[in-house]
Amino acid sequence: MLLSLVYINCDYLQAQTTIPRFEEGERVVFVGNSITHGGHYHSFIWLYYMTRFPDKPITIMNAGIGGESAWDMKDRLDYDVFNRKPTYVTLTFGMNDTGYDIYMKDNAKELSEQRIAKSLESYREIEERLLAKNKIKTVSYTHLTLPTKLEV
């Protein structure tokens, strides 16, 4: 009985969650760091669409660069993202933003706070610039949560 209720409840929740699909001709740019650059998730998304909707081709573009931070991505939005004329943009950042490489330095707390502030400023500017582009229908962000209080 309990399993039946769980199944019914999950089925109900699944029916309530509809993820819109990309339509024919959509242009999706995946922006990020090495996780995007070397990852294969964008290829899996393309393969999913090509095998299920072969009559509605989409374009998937990888704009990931290893070692990038949010401020690097912000600086290349015009020539590496907007020039591709995307209808969707997804961003993955955060791994290189918080200063994991500076924790052993004497002034680690100060350096980390500076990098966190720079990252937050970059996130805001990226958001503003993407939202100003009316032709980009959806903007998706994925980033690591920054600490609200830094303990070193």
Q: Which positions does each model-derived feature cover?
A:
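Conserved small/polar residues in nucleotide/adenosyl-binding loops
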Residues: 142-148
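Conserved SGNH/GDSL esterase-like catalytic core that processes O-acyl groups on lipids
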Residues: 17-124
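A short helix->loop->beta-strand "cap" motif at the edges of active sites that frequently abuts
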Residues: 133-137
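Bacterial Sec-dependent N-terminal signal peptides
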Residues: 1-16
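Residue-level signal for alpha-helix termini/capping positions
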Residues: 82, 131-132
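Short beta-strand segments at enzyme active-site cores
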Residues: 90-92, 138-141
